[in-house]
From Swiss-Prot:
MF terms in GO: 2-oxoglutarate-dependent dioxygenase activity; metal ion binding
Compartment(s) where it occurs, according to its Swiss-Prot or TrEMBL record: Cytoplasm, Cytosol
Cofactor(s) in the UniProt record: Fe(2+)
Residues that bind 2-oxoglutarate: R299
Signal peptide residue numbers: none
Protein name in the entry: Homoarginine-6-hydroxylase 2-ODD-C23.2
S-S bridge residues: none
Length: 357
């Protein structure tokens, strides 16, 4: 039997309007519960050259390794982003989605807008099936021609709504904080894989790209309406900011069962994506997840995707191939150009948008 860690740690999960206190000492697997990781010791030392020698960092790194190996999803607390900001992001997102449809269409997503902007319910497809959500899609902005012919598909400014008025400024501040947080979590993951804290920050993350999906899931009167079909995230690392009072995100565990990602106020849910699977030489596997909002209430989720450089040729890093050699030839070893991979995903997801544009 593997014990998570020896120190008794208590955290909370909000469910059915009350708090259950969980003794993490007793959690020996993640078959019904996602791990909760306080990363504050990591953040306190993240800019120190000798951070890997700090006892607090070592403990966090061990937890990250266990979570990434066993489930690929975990809650992040102690992340340094204020509850006020996290809640304000969700509050103003609700305000946008409550607007009349005609108002939301002012920032309609189109191919000529670089696939940036608002999409109505049913425009997004996962594995060929319609998803029952509406969303605003945003990407890191870049100068025309910066990424050559591949990048032309996504060229253009993000389309931020004029109502709420402060939304653009709020979200740009939030994006910067999520970018910094993601970089620091990846330093811990790099240590967990046996490298230095900075293995990802050379040719892979010198100029990191990002994607943000601001998603609204309507309340339903029938069960098991698929808000977003089962998928893995195609990027590097995801931070999910979800409503505190509705459980809709489900994660597939090692036994093939779907377990709920019950909201913890003030936390992020973090999960690894396909690019990290490749870079880690398959040590960490991206995990299938889906969204089913069985609540009659409207639910919002703001998902921030931290990515490699747009033009990065993603393949297993040498240090991780050395630390974690693989005997078999697998898909993991194949090189992927991130930007092309992203464009392929966008064009597949919005194939109908292309046809009808």
């Amino acid at each position: 039997m593997v014990i998570y860690h020896r120190k008794v740690v208590f955290t909370y999960v909000r469910a059915k309007r009350f708090y259950h206190f969980l003794n993490i000492e007793m959690v020996t697997d993640f078959k019904s519960l996602l791990p909760v990781i306080d990363i504050s010791p990591l953040l306190a030392k993240c800019d120190d050259f000798d951070m890997a020698e700090d006892a607090g960092v070592v403990e966090v790194v061990g937890k990250l390794d266990r979570a990434c190996r066993d489930v690929g999803f975990f809650y992040v607390i102690g992340h340094g982003i204020s509850d006020d900001l996290i809640n304000k992001v969700k509050e103003m997102t609700h305000q946008f989605f409550e607007l009349p449809y005609e108002e939301k269409l002012k920032i309609k997503i189109t191919p000529t807008a670089g696939y940036r902007g608002y999409q109505r319910i049913g425009v997004n497809f996962t594995s060929g099936k319609q998803d029952m959500h509406e969303a605003i899609d945003c990407y890191r902005e870049f100068k025309q021609g910066k990424h050559g012919d591949i990048g032309k598909v996504l060229e253009g400014p993000n389309q931020w709504p004029g109502n709420p008025q402060e939304y653009k400024d709020l979200m740009e501040k939030y994006i910067k904080l999520c970018t910094d947080l993601s970089r620091n979590i990846l330093r811990g993951i790099s240590l967990a894989l046996g490298g230095s804290p900075y293995e990802f920050e050379g040719k892979m993350l010198r100029d990191p790209f990002w994607v943000m999906r601001i998603i609204g899931y309507p309340g339903v009167n029938q069960e098991n309406v698929i808000g977003c079909g089962a998928h893995t995230d195609y990027g590097l690392l995801t931070l999910i900011n979800q409503d505190d009072d509705k459980t809709a995100l489900q994660v597939k565990n090692v036994d093939g069962d779907w377990i709920p990602a019950i909201p913890i106020p003030g936390s992020f849910i973090c999960n690894i994506g396909d690019m990290l699977t490749i870079l880690s030489n398959g040590v960490y596997q991206s995990t299938l997840h889906k969204v089913i909002n069985n609540s009659p209430k409207y639910r919002v989720c703001v998902a921030f995707f931290y990515e490699t450089n747009f033009e990065a040729e993603v393949e297993p890093l040498d240090i991780f191939k050395e630390k974690h050699p693989r005997k078999e030839t697998s898909q993991v070893a194949k090189r992927v150009v991130y930007g092309q991979h992203l464009i392929n995903k966008v064009l597949t997801t919005f194939a109908n948008l292309v046809e009808n544009s």
